[in-house]
From Swiss-Prot:
BP GO annotations: 'de novo' NAD biosynthetic process from L-aspartate
Pathway of action: Cofactor biosynthesis; NAD(+) biosynthesis; iminoaspartate from L-aspartate (oxidase route): step 1/1
Naturally occurring in which organism (per UniProt): Pseudomonas aeruginosa (strain ATCC 15692 / DSM 22644 / CIP 104116 / JCM 14847 / LMG 12228 / 1C / PRS 101 / PAO1)
Top EC class for this record: oxidoreductase
Protein name (Swiss-Prot/TrEMBL): L-aspartate oxidase
Amino acid sequence: MSQHYQHDVLVIGSGAAGLSLALTLPEHLRIAVLSKGELSQGSTYWAQGGVAAVLDDTDTVESHVEDTLVAGGGLCREDAVRFTVEHSREAIQWLIEQGVPFTRDEQHNHEEGSFEYHLTREGGHSHRRIIHAADATGAAIFNTLLAQARRRPNIELLSQRVAVDLITERKLGLPSKRCLGAYVLNRESGEVDTFRARFSVLASGGASKVYLYTSNPDGNSGDGIAMAWRAGCRVGNLEFNQFHPTCLYHPQAKSFLITEALRGEGALLRLPNGERFMPRFDPRGELAPRDIVARAIDHEMKRLGIDCVYLDISHKPAEFIKAHFPTVYERCLDFGIDITQQPIPVVPAAHYTCGGVLVDQHGHTDVPGLYAIGETTFTGLHGANRMASNSLLECFVYARSAAADMLQRLPGTPVPESLPSWDASQVTDSDEDVIIAHNWDELRRFMWDYVGIVRTNKRLQRAQHRVRLLLSEIDEFYSNYKVSRDLIELRNLALVAELIIRSAMQRRESRGLHYTLDYPDLLPEARDTILVPPIYGD
């Protein structure tokens, strides 16, 4: 039997954004936090870098704002950048109060400033402003926030729950369009439960799984973006997908990034015949910026029809390699690759979704009662290219802002009345899951080949034709068979793929992370790509 649940706030996603919002709300509110798999399966846990914030006396808000605007290729919304940076210090202070074990500065009286925690500097930042917990910041933050949430009796943490779709007044045939909750698959019972809430929050991460190679966990299938679109929310700048240049290429090695520090220490990129190729693309060779290296690798893979290229540091002494890169050395050894003697097979991998659901500074979407926070959103902070360590900051700042806004609106927002149960009377168990597996593989392959790092009009047109055929097949399957996690994710991923393709076709220039051979130059005016759903408006 399916279940009915009632909460004040329903949070779809258990990462940095979702947990922060739940913990910021007062303890008298009943809150549900849903995770598709185990609670730790989101992107937050795997984030290695840190959180960018203005913390040291030598740094300024203006400097952080300017660095972000430059990285964003003219498309950042300055009000969103300023709002995020101005609230960065208090967000970090809140994390410290929660107990996050950030790395302290052993030389606290160092000349550069007076902040007691160690700050690093990353690409694009003009100051040391990245607060971190060694090289596993995401895990430290996630474990701390999860432990705090488990201490709160008002926060219900529910794993193995996959949101199928949002429930809105419009979908129930009512005149307005408020969000009332969601239908959620319980993977343990196989039933679709009904969750009703005064406010619903999409905090479900990005959509990098739309590509064949990704550095993200399996769950990043664009669920929040797809559900918001179907509910009537606009989306923006989905053509901007960030790619990391070197992910380990091995059938068993899911999502393992090979740090850029290897190239910093002299590692060379080679073709299968051993030839170096980076000097042909940039005088800095392997030390060129991330997007240039990713494009060069992509070009060579397409030109030669090869599956990967090779990163070679074997010309360095073995002891040097083991001392400087113990994690990479051990992990590659697990897969039978001794990096002291042989090159590492690598491919670029989809890393971050810069666009998403349109929201304001409080996380409001176009649908009343529905908020969105984190990588699911398009706030205007990242523009055409995300700067390192701004993404976690965005999660905390917007989660806290959304929570404050909810508190103001709660007195005038009643709990929705009883909602209809999920209707599974017209569907049967699938005996053709091979269709899901085939469509899944086809989608991720053509998105990688045609809508990846380098694009052309013809590639985008081919991709659009194929994705529309897939959407038709998936909709038919969805109408006839019981839902599963794979089917829900495939349905969402195909929709987001179509939105990415449509966004890319509208941008007739090369800007930031969107690079097309047919329009290699910048247009004089920078404009966002905003897509409007069929049911947008009243």
